[in-house]
Amino acid sequence: MKISHYLDATYLKTAIQAGITEKENLEKVVALAKEAISYDYKLVMIRSNYITTVKKIVSISGAKVLIGTVIDFPCGDSSLKQKIQEAEKAIKLGADELDFVVNYNAFKKGNIDVVTEEVTLCIALCLSHQKIAKFIIEAAALSNEEIIVISQLVKHIVLENFGEENAKNVFVKSSTGFFKTEREIPNGATFENIMLISKNAKPLKIKAAGGVRDYETALKMISLGADRIGTSSSKEIINKEQHSNQSY
């Protein structure tokens, strides 16, 4: 197993969030793209305004690194029309994979139809362009029962509308990494929520994201069913893997 092929190397902060200039933020994105090429990561996950720049860097290198972006991030409560428009723009710019934030607040209020419609139409859009769709459920905002229900919901939408052959093209993703929790409760992927998602969303793919910062945690997430790891600590994970391999 080559752990680099599980990694969605991620940088999603805006310049304002990072407290730096737009130029400095762009430099961070460019550095991540070059790192992804050097370490053979699966994907670079960035804001859509950087897709063109990163795509050019990857293309010139000849690397197989994919480019992903987030849609309706981080709250997921925009209208369906806005979600679709944002996704269409990202596809046009050249994104290979789109990570949609599900309208989890609507789901929590019992508005299942809202989630069903947006997930169905977003999958249809992605599949029509041969793109991968990932749905961020924001597990930290949900109870265990809600995690089970929404994971099963996405699974059933795929199997009933798009067939099991497309299960490999749709992910359920744990977290944005931006959700604010109380009392230092983890806001990202935990072993418990990845187990729940995996048990209830398979044969769909699973992405563990938020708080996965070391090699051991990444390995554990993979053993629990994660097919992809979203992390801003890809280099640290890779370096530890290389160190571990040299120890044998």
List the model feature ranges, each with a label.
Residues 48-72, 112-134, 141, 148-160, ...:
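Alpha-helix-loop-beta-strand connector modules within alpha/beta enzyme cores
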Residues 78-92, 142-153, 196-204, 212-228:
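Catalytic cores of alpha/beta
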Residues 18-23, 180-188:
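Short, flexible/disordered intra-domain loops and linkers
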Residues 33-53, 98-116, 138, 172-185:
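Glycine-rich, proline-tolerant flexible connector loops at the mouths of alpha/beta enzymes
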Residues 1-80, 92, 153:
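Conserved N-terminal beta1-alpha1 strand-loop-helix module at the mouth
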Residues 2-14, 44-46, 65-72, 98-100, ...:
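Hydrophobic faces of well-ordered beta-strands that scaffold small-molecule active sites
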Residues 11, 69-70, 80, 92-107, ...:
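Glycine-rich phosphate-binding active-site loops on the catalytic face of alpha/beta enzymes
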Residues 74-89, 109-118:
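Glycine-rich anion/phosphate-binding loops
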